[in-house]
Structure formats: C-alpha cells, structure tokens
Amino acid sequence: MTERISITPTHRYRNNDKLIGIGNEFWDMSERNGLAGLVADLDSGVLRTTAGHEFVADGHEFINFSCCSYLDLDSHPRVIEGGLDAMRRYGVLDHCIARSRVQIPAMLELEDSLGELFGAHVVCSIAASTATFGLLPLIASGHLGNGIRPLMVFDKNAHISMSNLKPVCADETEVVTSPHHDLDFIEDACRKYARVAYVCDGSDSLGGYAPVKELAELQDKYGLLVYYDDSHSLSAYGERGVGYVRTHSPVLDERTIVVVTLNKAFGTSGAAIVLDGYEKETLRVIERFGGALNYSQLLNTAAVGAGLASAEIHRTPELTTLQDRLYRNIELFDSLVHTEQTGSTYPIRLVPLSDETVIEAGRRVFEAGFYVSPVFFPIVARGTAGLRVMMRAGQTEEQIRRLCAVLTEVGACPAIPAPGEAAR
C-alpha cells in the first residue's frame, strides 16, 4: 500500500497548535479556580451562582465588573418593552429567508433609524463578526473600494473576528501584519502599493483608541482605506453615542468603513455596518455576496424592536446622563487604581499581573464578591496577562471603592494622589 501523505501546516496566518496548546492551560486553570464556565442568576445587579459548577459553591454572590453593557441599556425598561412591541407589531420572531429574496420590513426600519442616528447608510447584521466575514473578502478583491485589489494590512492587535479573515483575504490579495498602530509601517506600505487597506479596532478590547486623526492624514495623502471595528465605543462615546471613530475622523466617505456591535453599550443585539459614499450598486454587492450577511439568519424581530428603542434613547438627554455617570465611575476608579488607561474615557482598564499570578488574583477578587476576567495568551501576548475591568454607568461608588481595595491587595498599582490630596 502506498504511504499516505501527512500534511505539514504553513502556519502563515494562524497557529492553532500554539493557540490551543498554551491558551487551553490558562482556560483550564481559570475554570478550576471558578473564573470560567460560571452560570449565575441576575437580580438587581447582583449575580448568584447556580448549582452545577464543579469548582464553585452554589449561591455565591458577586458583582460583574467584566460586562460590556457600559450604559446598562440592556436592562432598560424601554429597551425590553421595545422588543416585545416589535413582536406584537410584526407577529413573527424570525422570517427565515435570505433578505435579498424576501424580507419583512423590520430590519429596514432599524437600518433607517440607525442611518439617521449616524448620518450614514447602515446595513445590519446578526453580529459584528458576521459583518466582518462578509466585508473583508470584498475589500480584498477590490469590489468594496475603488476597484483596485489592496494590500491588506492587519493590525497586530486586531480582534480575532478580523484577524481570522487573513487566510480568506489572502486568497484574493496580499496580506501582511503591522505592529500595533505603527503609522510608519502603514505609510511605507502606502508608498509601495497602489492601494492599501488597514484593518484595526477603533476602540481596543483591552483599552485604548486608534490614532484616527493620524490615519485620516494617510487617507487624504494616499487614499488609504481604513476598516474599523469600533464596537467598544459605540453609545459610550460621542454626541448621540456615535462612537470614537465617527466623532474624530474627518474622513467620513468611502475610505472609512466602521463596524459596530449593538450588543455592548447599545444594549441590544446584532451589529451595524456604517457606510458613507457608496453607490446603490455596491450596496447590492454587499447584500448578495457578503456571505452570512445574506443568509437566512437575520436579526430577529425582538432584537430589531429593542434596537429601535435604544436608538430613541440615543436621541434624548438621557444618553448624555448615562455617559456622564460612566465617566464619573471611570474617574473614581482611576483615582484609586493606576493603569495604562488612566485618564482616558475608555471604559476598560487592564490591571497588569504576571502569567503566574493572574489566575490566583482573579480567584481572590471573586471570593471577595467581584468578577473581573483574567486575560492571558492568546487574548494578550505572553507575559502581558492581567485582570480586565469594565466600568458601567450603573455601578455604585461603594462597589467601585470595594473592588479597588481588593485589586490593590492582589497586586494592582495604587493611584498616585494628586498634588495636595495626600495631605487631606
């Protein structure tokens, strides 16, 4: 019998052996220490573990400081009622057919509302990752852009929902990875290639914003296309909650594409693709050839109704009130614990710890009544582990002060008092 061929992976764009081999050990440690696989009932902002977790006692109460609902809109009465109202109006949960063939008007209603909110054309998707899966290959082939196949430059820290598309895009064009927010690298690519597309987070899941204004200069100079996932700043930042990118970028045309999830501060479900300057024919190409964007798994009617209600809240002074509460809570945290994100409006703080101590620290914080998620490779680079703290508008001063006291006990750096403050 002829010897069968074994395959040697190229590992050019991903390496599951490395990701799983190293990362799974941390996940197993997290679960053994009660920091993963948790199931808990939620009542008035307090979570209580249920029976069934091998390593966590039933009935342990804790406050979740790793939730992305930065404005707590996911529990807003108007948002909940909006989902119910849409169900009553349309009389169906999910009209299961590709929207390019037949659709009920529910998602069109949400797209129109979000389009007015953003001042742009909006296409909705079931998830931001689904939107990215549909759009990046079209950018790589030149069908979304100016017709020229671009060099696809993925930021080293781009979220996995984007970086996972490297091998798919590489079947259409050349793909490279840049150091994090390295403007010189990007400009050098722009000088060499007729067209360049840069793929990055507008707001990083580990804290911080993209250099939007500096990238806009490269857009004006070279025609650079920038694809932003700005999910973590939607609603939490900017007038009417339009997010960091659309607040600060002076290039809001076909050279800037923004994808945002509606699951975080917006408080509902699904995602929005925010487009400027694209003709109807191009939008049809997205609808027809954007992969899962055109499958029968669309936003269900309840999610649409909740989205409509949240969008209406964004048009009222209540949004500013919630943003201000969030910012005050961020400032309070920064006055007690120092991180690299101190002083920014970004709602995520990363408390750096070693790979060896991060799980134990997270366990001690959990035992004290708070959940903060430990992050480790492959979520972050090896040797840069930490506890990820997410601030929300609904957190109380007492909760924040208690959490910060526990964090400093497990190794967080206390904040440096302002001049004159220590003497009080």
Each language-model region and where it sits:
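Conserved PLP-anchoring active-site segment centered on the Schiff-base-forming lysine
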Residues: L138-S161, E174, S178-P179
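Conserved N-terminal alpha-helix of the aminotransferase class I/II PLP-enzyme fold
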Residues: I80-A127
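Conserved core segment of the aminotransferase class I/II
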Residues: S269-P317
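Active-site phosphate-binding strand-loop segment of PLP-dependent enzymes
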Residues: V175-Y227
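N-terminal "arm"/small-domain region of PLP-dependent enzymes with the aminotransferase-like
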Residues: T2-L93, L224
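Conserved PLP-binding catalytic core of the aspartate aminotransferase-like
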Residues: T320-D334, H338-G369, I379, M391-A393, ...
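Conserved PLP-binding active-site segment of the aspartate aminotransferase-like
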Residues: S30, C67-Y70, P347-E356, F370-L407
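Active-site PLP attachment segment
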Residues: H248-R284
